[in-house]
Structures are given as C-alpha cells and as structure tokens.
Amino acid sequence: MKKLLKSVLAFAVLGSASSLHALPVGNPAEPSLMIDGILWEGFGGDPCDPCTTWCDAISLRLGYYGDFVFDRVLKTDVNKQFEMGAAPTGDADLTTAPTPASRENPAYGKHMQDAEMFTNAAYMALNIWDRFDVFCTLGATSGYLKGNSAAFNLVGLFGRDETAVAADDIPNVSLSQAVVELYTDTAFAWSVGARAALWECGCATLGASFQYAQSKPKVEELNVLCNAAEFTINKPKGYVGQEFPLNIKAGTVSATDTKDASIDYHEWQASLALSYRLNMFTPYIGVKWSRASFDADTIRIAQPKLETSILKMTTWNPTISGSGIDVDTKITDTLQIVSLQLNKMKSRKSCGLAIGTTIVDADKYAVTVETRLIDERAAHVNAQFRF
C-alpha cells in the first residue's frame, strides 16, 4: 500500500510539471514539516502534559507567497433581460428616439475568454502543536480580463435620422462581433486561512484547509476592439446605477457624476489533500471547492467623444453602409452613444485539482510549488522559514 501511494503521488507531481493548469491548496503536511526553528528549537512534547505551556506549543513562520493564475474559468452573473432601445426593423431611418424595451440580455451566461491574476505577497503563519496553522498574506495583485463584447453589453445607437444626438436618445443595437479587454493596476491584496493535519499514518498525512481572499484593483486600461467603434481608455470612469439614457455629455472631458472603474474581487476556498513524505520531498495531491466573484458595480463606461464636432465628427467611428456624411450632415450611418458595462462575473466551475510538492531543508526551511487545473490554470510558489 505504501509503495502504491508513493507511486501515485510521484507520478502526479512529475506528470504535471510540464504544464501549468487564485488560491492555492498548499501541502496538508505543512504544519508538521518544519519542526525546528532558526532561533528556537522545536518542542515535541505532549499537549496533554500539565507542565506544557502555550509558549511551547506556538511557533511562527514567515516567507514569500506567489500565486499566478493564467486562466480562471469565469462567466457573467447578470439578469436574463436587458433594458435598452427596441431593435431596429426594416430599412427606414429612425425619425424619433428608440422606444425603451426589455430585450434578451446578450451577456447572460457568457464565458470569459481569458482571466488572469498575479499576486505577490508576504506570508505569515502561526503554528500550534505542529498540527494546525493559522496564516495570512499581505501583498499586491494585478489582473487581466478578455471576453466577447456581448459579455460587456457593448451597445450603440444606429439609424437615427438627425444631425445630432438628442438627450432622450438611447442605444438600439448590441455589438457582439467584437472583443473587450481590460488591465487592472497593482492593488493591495490580502487573504486569511487555516490548515490542519487531520490524520497521519507513517509518512502519509491527510489535511484540510479553508481560505478567504480579497482585493479591489482599479481598471488601468480598457480596450474595445470593434470595427464599428474601436477605442481605448486609460483609467476609465463611468456611471453606476444609471439607466439609459446616459447624460448627453457622457464620454466627454466635462462629464460629471462619474466614478473610477474598479473590480471588487472576493474568493473563498475549502480543500482536502493527501501527502506522503519521501526524505526531503513531500508530494501531495488535493481537491478544492471554491467560489470567486468579480464585481464592478455594473459600471457603464461611454466611448470617448468630443463635445463639439470637428470636421463634422465627434468620434472616429466609421460609416457602416459606406454612404458617408450626407449633405445634411446626418448621423444615420455612424454608430453613436456607444457604451459598455463591466458586468459581475463568477466562477464557472467550483471544483478543482491541485498537485504539488514541498522541499524541506534541515527541518527549518521549505519551498512549495503547486499547479492547479480544471477550474483554473495556475501556479503557486511558497518559500518560508520557521523562527
């Protein structure tokens, strides 16, 4: 049985090292791997001994925590209906503002194409009886999101038979043949958790852990890659809780009542893992259940535009049917009042697999490397020492 367990764990770790598939699982035996300290010797007494004190039971570990998510599996978390202008019908231009209508939400259940997050932090763990860890991380994180424009409710007004947009005009077309991507700045991030070695038999250890993480980075850059309305915004601002129509000055430098776009990230995770110590190597394999959410308050961001036209244009949006600006300088053939919203996103899969190994030196220092897959493709590195 021991040989079989060794073979399974070693094969899992070595087989996953060639490819990397928010929160790491960690080695279940970590609370009991470093039993000696660089300043104080470890204590191996009996917890039931009446002469034992809490000073003997508690130890401290410090180190580096790096977590690199290359692709988190996310989907939008929105309502099935979306309020905007009624869809155009026929070939006639619109002589009046579009009628508000409740339409099928193109963002409902949309999967994100790419979601990345990179965290570097300090790691601190309080150990009790070489069996339990209470730990936290303090550091910084940055992220990247990319998805189809439908997932961001990219909309605009088309076919309006007027020379300028009116205050009561609302979008009537949804753009789904485009891509939206955003980069966040580097923001403060923290996490807390607990880990326990629940069962030990020889060199095998079964353990469990629970963690919670939070961060709120601001959107540093927003790119909309669309033939009908392509634009980039640095440090975008938008409207929270604002229904259509947006303010007529939305997207201009004089727009008011806007706020910075930021993403509130929360995640919790519970895991169960099994490890087996092989001299200085301790490979492990574990399963995890997690839920992550990315909430930007459904902020709506308007395409940048000029307050007054220059060369009969307020944006660089091209003509759609090729007719260009007619003699009356009407806006019929160009996309107007373009905007998008940052919808709430959540985990598309709750269960994942983690495979890793820990290298221990002199019972005082340890380095853990881990890969995760199924619900995300990620890598984790943790280096620490015991006082």
Curated annotation (Swiss-Prot):
Is Ion transport among this UniProt entry's keywords?
Answer: yes
GO BP annotation list: monoatomic ion transport; regulation of cell shape
The family note in this entry says: Belongs to the chlamydial porin (CP) (TC 1.B.2) family.
Which membrane topology term applies here? Multi-pass membrane protein
Signal peptide stretch: 1-22
Q: Which InterPro entries match?
A: Major_OMP_Chlamydia
Task: Assign the protein's first listed, main location to one coarse class.
Answer: membrane
Annotated compartments: Cell outer membrane
State the oligomer form and interacting partners. Part of a disulfide cross-linked outer membrane complex (COMC) composed of the major outer membrane porin (MOMP), the small cysteine-rich protein (OmcA) and the large cysteine-rich periplasmic protein (OmcB).
What does it do?
A: In elementary bodies (EBs, the infectious stage, which is able to survive outside the host cell) provides the structural integrity of the outer envelope through disulfide cross-links with the small cysteine-rich protein and the large cysteine-rich periplasmic protein. It has been described in publications as the Sarkosyl-insoluble COMC (Chlamydia outer membrane complex), and serves as the functional equivalent of peptidoglycan.
Q: What is this protein called?
A: Major outer membrane porin
> What keywords does the record list, in alphabetical order?
Cell outer membrane, Cell shape, Disulfide bond, Ion transport, Membrane, Porin, Signal, Transmembrane, Transmembrane beta strand, Transport
Q: Which GO terms describe its molecular function?
A: porin activity; structural molecule activity
Q: Which gene encodes it?
A: ompA
UniProt KW Ribonucleoprotein keyword? no
Q: Which GO terms describe its cellular component?
A: cell outer membrane; pore complex
Q: Which organism is it from?
A: Chlamydia muridarum (strain MoPn / Nigg)
